Regions:
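Active-site-adjacent "subsite" loops/lids of carbohydrate-active enzymes
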Residues: 1-49
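Surface-exposed beta-strand/loop patches in extracellular or lumenal glycoproteins
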Residues: 310-342
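Solvent-exposed beta-strand/loop surfaces of large extracellular or lumenal domains
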Residues: 344-370
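Contiguous ligand/interfacial binding patches
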Residues: 346, 389-420
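C-terminal beta-strand-rich structural cap/linker in extracellular carbohydrate-active enzymes
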Residues: 366-388, 418-435
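C-terminal outer-membrane/trafficking sorting elements
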Residues: 352, 441-483
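Active-site neighborhood of glycoside hydrolase catalytic domains
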Residues: 28-133, 139-149
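Active-site-proximal substrate-binding groove within the catalytic cores of carbohydrate-active enzymes
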Residues: 91, 95-137, 142-303, 307-314
């Protein structure tokens, strides 16, 4: 039973309307009879279908109170409910945890995840230790860049493991009334921020990008550029996961770019005296390149996020207004980093440059200052600083090669198509290489053919084959053409 807005009480099964579709019944996860019923139903599913587990969903904080132990009286021969024991809906947060623990106890070998809609019940959910990762669906009051970092850190704290990960559902341009293609810069700035902070994102369903919580809805499309870029971003997320979210500890660095201070992400807690989340000034600084930095062992990871033409009004992920500008791409910027510890190696990588291939950079270190040149910064570039003694006191070099035809050719710029192969060589090897590396040995021709007793057919590379096909072969000391 729930209080009516106009007074009195409403006794009915609460439903969440879905337009022309059947409504969803809203159940009380603290009701033991319902939990027992659902547990039995889930067990039947597991007995007949080989699911690995299931996703538990909720609707967030919908109401302030509900009533149990209802009281009634007869009015004109009809039962009328008049009162009951008022309960706070925040009780549901504890109910969520008990529900998760019950489901895990019933099927300990199955996996669970539960959506903390707008963080409702989030601490209790991840605190069970029985969900595989934090899952947070972000809506209007949550969608602030500083809040994404806070949720990632809160989930790790409440779970008790610094390696605990978080996945966000933040639907791009959700129901803003517009059609057409997604805003590419909105998608890439959002992914750059979430991934750099150590999070992940659920935004793809089949072959399309999500813009509502109804996953089959594919009314909005990705541009060709976004389709290509999104592959680079997810390749990058997987390739460098140990540098992004593997128990790293937050830190801050002092850095200049062409002599101008680079802003460090403000890691402060929200100001409790500021009522509106939109008015918080923590997190990144607008109209600036920002760093978000972590350490692990002797390695410091510096995430450079290029907000140099982004206002605070655009410091959200979903970009309902579709006003996120494209970044001003920065090239060959001189970086000076404060670091008193001996640096052995620096390399950079970006999903926006060379398909994410790592590039070792030349650097010098004097009196606690490390200087190097940053090749490129579009949306996001990661700088990895490794500490320790240098194996070689000479300046470091690196060469990256992109497959073109039957050779790997030294990469000169960032124009790399999706799906191409890359080679990247360390400094000691790079100095010995040429600008082109053929896949097969190159010969100037066949000379000094000597007849011998060996029979069979040999390729020009000296490989014996049983039956020649098209090409040039050596047989009984003579050159022949296979047809």
């Amino acid at each position: 039973m729930h209080e009516k807005k106009g007074g009195g009480y409403d006794l009915r099964q609460v439903q969440y309307p879905l337009g022309n579709w059947p409504s969803i019944y809203v159940m009380n996860p603290g009701n033991p009879q319902w939990v027992n019923y659902l547990s039995g139903s889930i067990n039947k599913v597991y007995q007949n279908l080989r699911f690995d587990g299931y996703h538990i969903d909720q609707l967030g904080h919908q109401r302030e109170a509900y009533y149990v132990n209802l009281k009634s009286k007869k009015v004109n021969g009809k039962k009328v409910y008049t009162d009951g024991d008022r309960r706070d809906t925040h009780d549901f947060e504890d109910y969520f945890a008990k529900f998760i623990n019950r489901m895990k106890a019933d099927n300990h070998n199955k996996y669970l995840v539960m959506n903390a809609v707008s963080t409702f019940g989030g601490a209790k959910i991840v605190g069970t230790g029985n969900v595989e990762f934090g899952y947070n669906e972000m809506w209007d009051g949550d969608d602030y860049l500083w809040n994404y970092r806070k949720i990632i850190q809160d989930n790790r704290y409440n779970n008790g493991k610094n390696t605990f990960n978080t996945v966000f559902a933040a639907y791009l341009h959700c129901r803003n009334g517009n059609g057409g293609q997604f805003h590419t810069s909105s998608a890439l700035f959002g992914n750059a921020t979430i991934f750099a902070l150590g999070g992940s994102r659920i935004e793809l369903s089949g072959d399309h990008m999500l813009f509502t919580e109804y996953f089959p809805d594919n009314a909005r499309k990705m541009s060709e550029k976004l389709q290509e870029s999104i592959i680079h971003y997810y390749d990058f997320l997987v390739a460098y996961e140990n540098y992004l979210r593997d128990g790293n500890v937050e830190t801050s660095v002092n850095m200049t770019m062409d002599g101008v201070n680079v802003a460090a992400w403000d890691l402060s807690a929200p100001n409790p005296s500021v009522a509106e989340a939109a008015n918080q000034t923590i997190g990144p600084k607008p109209y600036s390149v920002n760093t978000y930095s972590t350490t692990k062992g002797d390695v410091t990871m510096i995430q450079l996020l290029n907000y140099n033409n982004v206002s605070r009004d655009n410091f959200n992920i979903r970009d309902l207004k579709e006003t996120m500008p494209e970044p001003n791409v920065l090239k060959n910027k001189k970086i000076v980093l404060d670091d008193a510890t001996s640096v052995s190696r620096i390399w950079v990588a970006s999903p926006d440059y060379l398909g994410g291939a790592p590039q070792e950079v030349v650097f010098s270190q004097r009196e606690g200052k490390v200087s190097f040149t940053l090749p490129s910064l579009a949306y996001w570039t990661m700088v990895v600083v490794e500490h320790g003694n240098k194996a070689d006191s000479s300046e470091t070099e690196v060469k990256n090669y992109v497959l073109q035809g039957e050779s790997f050719v030294e990469a000169k710029d960032e124009a790399v198509a999706v799906g191409e192969a890359y080679l990247s060589f360390p400094a000691t090897v790079a100095k010995t290489l040429h600008a082109s590396l053929p896949l097969v040995p190159v010969t100037d021709g066949i000379t000094n053919v000597t007849d011998n007793v060996r029979t069979g057919y040999y390729t020009v590379s000296g490989i014996k084959v049983d039956k020649p096909v098209k090409g040039v072969y050596i047989h009984n000391g003579k050159k022949i053409m296979g047809k």
